[in-house]
Amino acid sequence: MQSIEQLQHIINKAIAETKYTAKPTELYAPITYLMELGGKRMRPVLVLLSTELFGGNVFKALDAAIGIELFHNFTLMHDDIMDKAPLRRGKPTVHAKWNESAGILSGDVMFVEAYKRMIKVDDSILRDVLDVFSDTASGVCQGQQADMNFEKRDNVSIEEYLRMIKQKTAVLLAGSMQIGALIGGAEKQQALLLYEFGENLGIAFQLQDDILDVYGNPEKFGKQVGGDIISNKKTFMLIKAKELAQDSVAAELDMWLSNSDHDPEEKVNTVTSIYNLLKVRQLVEKEMEHFVKKALHALSRVSVESSKKQILQGFAEQLLIREH
């Protein structure tokens, strides 16, 4: 098994060597820009790791891995427009650097380019791989719509929130692993166990993201800290805080959520203080650990040598240790 760093190098090299020569150049420049912003490449790495886990050649899975990364970045490009986000990985977002129309159209082309990569897999598994990829893509869009629907609602349950992040975030990690396993020659049931691993890990990852949005270092996080609080985004932290807050604390929280004429920094500081008072962060971390354990249980049922699975266990640890 190759290390995560070796697989990241293979992926980054393939991305750097990808040149979009089609016209007009303005359509493709944002794709190159966003893809070259970097990141951990966790989803394509999971494709390659899953292929290797079952004895497959990572280079046979490389096109599918790049396809997954293209799709992931397409969702980021469009999400940033919907969220009006100024930064992505510490740099201006595509719509901030160009404009919203360019971001929408370039994102559409990224989705097409992702499919063009995905259909390069071996014909014997093409149908299965495309089924997983299509279901994954639909799930991500369904999750995004659910997230947008939450904006219009005063109350969202923890159960609803977990279902939304499973679709919006976790299914892409899960689908990446299932596709990699299929390319590596895994039986369908074994590939589904990797899907289960990725799904639970993805939920844990999003919960960690919720924590970092409040408590992270913006330089290391690569995004605006406190953005979820400023926009009243329904995260696990806010939903749990609304459940737990009583009397004067509940009144103060409601005041900040309903008042649009506020100083953003003061709002972030005050709501964060409420989270601290209610020990919401510790509750999110406990929930996160629950899903990590579920992920590792699924991995334990995968029928390959334990030594091969160690790298995925390590990946899980790396995924969840994002610097604050």
Language-model features, listed with the residues they occupy:
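All-alpha prenyltransferase/terpene-synthase fold signal
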Residues: 1-324
